[in-house]
């Protein structure tokens, strides 16, 4: 798909022309900052800059933290305490890094759900969406391995439980688990591997972010209406767009400042609110915590993992059909990874010709029920797997898969969309034009 017509950088001085012929970096920066952006973007589109800030924060604080960290089972916990007590500003660096991960995931979940609501995955933006899902998977892997590094009780037992999932794969599971751990159990080789990968993956994420930005700069940004920018000429495109600089940069920086006020308040006044007290106890393989839970951003999928027990009829059916090869544990692993995979497949599961949920009356109800379902699964994932909680988790898991595999494909067939604006300019004038906001 051709890019949006716009003015490109033209070198004016002799030096600029000389540099442009050899390294057109000024042109690259100009085209990035001055890219035409739909003028009707709302606050849902501010989270990109929050994500960029979080990535830079995590890499910067992480680099300093590893200068003082020792990846050895006998020294890791003590080295973290050394950072907290003896390194100048060490406690602040650690709290920024830990809470920065939470802000990172909060922003990415809002970013994903915004994309699901406004149809940012639909053609021609499928590649942008898939690269975004790859970034999310890399974030999950990086965060999990980072959670193991402090070598507290929850770090150790969380690693034991999650790596144990690979052992559920029939036939080759135990061999894969041993290969991942570097031995029969979570120990020093595991810690060293996780430390190395935790340091490496943020740079892989940064590279994928560049590809992600490149992809949506090629196709153009989506917008609340889902209507494409007119591309017949520069004049037409200018009626639907504004340059990214200064309009959206200033808006995004203001939004980032508001988010950071809340973020630094949490870091300064309740930095351990989202953590777990058991992780301030050094790892002990002989003492199992009463309740093993991952970080909050993994809880929805952890709830799905635990929801499918041996007494669930669908598990019993699959177990019987597979001649006992797929047991409840392996079924839970499939369900957990499948819950993430269906989000990557949503460009082909959504059959509606209308991109934005703003004009889909039936879709809105099912979508917001999905958002509630996600929060409920997060809550259930933090609860013990007893009493009514497994039933709630099972119901939440069922709706999650039903939404993507049944409801979304059917809605595109049966739903009658509302009237849509023909252009972004029309939508913008309807909301922000002089008729809408008359001068006083």
Swiss-Prot record:
UniProt GO molecular function: metal ion binding; ubiquinol-cytochrome-c reductase activity
Membrane-spanning parts: 46-66, 100-120, 129-149, 156-176, 194-214, 253-273, 296-315, 330-350, 365-385, 394-414
Keyword line: Cell membrane, Electron transport, Heme, Iron, Membrane, Metal-binding, Respiratory chain, Transmembrane, Transmembrane helix, Transport
Gene Ontology BP terms: respiratory electron transport chain
Residues that hold heme b b566 according to the record: 111, 212
Compartments where located: Cell membrane
Signal sequence annotation: none
Membrane-topology annotation of the record: Multi-pass membrane protein
Binding site for heme b b562: 97, 198
Gene3D superfamilies recorded: Cytochrome Bc1 Complex, Chain C (1.20.810.10)
Required cofactor names: heme b
Cofactor annotation comment: Binds 2 heme b groups non-covalently.
Record carries keyword Magnesium: no
One term under GO cellular component: respiratory chain complex III
Chief place where the protein resides: membrane
KW Membrane (keyword) present: yes
UniProt similarity note: Belongs to the cytochrome b family.
Something else known: Heme 1 (or BL or b562) is low-potential and absorbs at about 562 nm, and heme 2 (or BH or b566) is high-potential and absorbs at about 566 nm.
Record note on quaternary structure: The main subunits of complex b-c1 are: cytochrome b, cytochrome c1 and the Rieske protein.
Matches recorded under PANTHER family: CYTOCHROME B
Functional summary from the UniProt entry: Component of the ubiquinol-cytochrome c reductase complex (complex III or cytochrome b-c1 complex), which is a respiratory chain that generates an electrochemical potential coupled to ATP synthesis.
Protein name: Cytochrome b
Species the sequence originates in: Paracoccus denitrificans
Lineage: Bacteria, Pseudomonadati, Pseudomonadota, Alphaproteobacteria, Rhodobacterales
């Amino acid at each position: 798909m051709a890019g949006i017509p716009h003015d490109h950088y033209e070198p004016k001085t002799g030096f600029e022309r000389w540099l442009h012929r050899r390294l057109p970096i000024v042109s690259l920066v100009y085209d990035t900052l001055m890219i035409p952006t739909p003028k009707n973007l709302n606050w849902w589109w501010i989270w990109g800059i929050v994500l960029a800030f979080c990535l830079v924060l995590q890499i910067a604080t992480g680099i300093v933290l590893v200068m003082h960290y020792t990846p050895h089972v006998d020294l890791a916990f003590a080295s973290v305490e050394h950072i907290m007590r003896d390194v100048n500003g060490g406690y602040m660096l650690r709290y920024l890094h830990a809470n920065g991960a939470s802000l990172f995931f909060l922003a990415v979940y809002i970013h994903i759900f915004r994309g699901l609501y406004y149809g940012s995955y639909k053609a021609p933006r499928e590649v942008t969406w898939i690269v975004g899902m790859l970034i999310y998977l890399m974030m999950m892997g990086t965060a999990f391995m980072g959670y193991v590094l402090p070598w507290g009780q929850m770090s150790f037992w969380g690693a034991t439980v999650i790596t144990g999932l690979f052992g559920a794969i029939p036939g080759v599971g135990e061999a894969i688990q041993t290969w991942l751990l570097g031995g029969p159990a979570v120990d020093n080789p595991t810690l060293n591997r996780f430390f190395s990968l935790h340091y490496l993956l943020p740079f892989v994420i940064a590279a994928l972010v560049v590809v992600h930005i490149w992809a949506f700069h090629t196709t153009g940004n989506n917008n609340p209406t889902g209507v494409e920018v007119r591309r017949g000429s520069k004049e037409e495109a200018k009626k639907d767009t504004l340059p990214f600089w200064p309009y959206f940069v200033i808006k995004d920086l203001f939004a980032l400042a508001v988010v950071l006020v809340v973020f630094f308040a949490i870091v300064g006044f309740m930095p351990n609110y989202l953590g777990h007290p058991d992780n301030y106890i050094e790892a002990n393989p002989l003492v199992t915590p009463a309740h093993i839970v991952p970080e909050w951003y993994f809880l929805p999928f952890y709830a799905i993992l635990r929801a499918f027990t041996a007494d669930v009829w669908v598990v019993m059916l699959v177990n019987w059909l597979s001649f006992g090869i797929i047991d409840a544990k392996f079924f839970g692993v499939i369900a957990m990874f499948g819950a993430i995979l269906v989000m990557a497949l949503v460009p082909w599961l959504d059959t509606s010709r209308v991109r934005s949920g703003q004009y889909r009356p039936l879709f809105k109800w099912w979508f917001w029920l999905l958002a509630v379902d996600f929060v409920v699964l997060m809550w259930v994932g933090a609860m013990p797997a007893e009493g009514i909680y497994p039933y709630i988790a099972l119901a939440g898991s069922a709706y999650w898969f039903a939404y993507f595999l049944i409801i979304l494909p059917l809605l595109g067939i049966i739903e009658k969309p509302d009237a849509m604006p023909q252009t972004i300019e029309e939508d913008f004038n309807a909301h922000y034009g002089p008729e809408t906001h008359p001068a006083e």
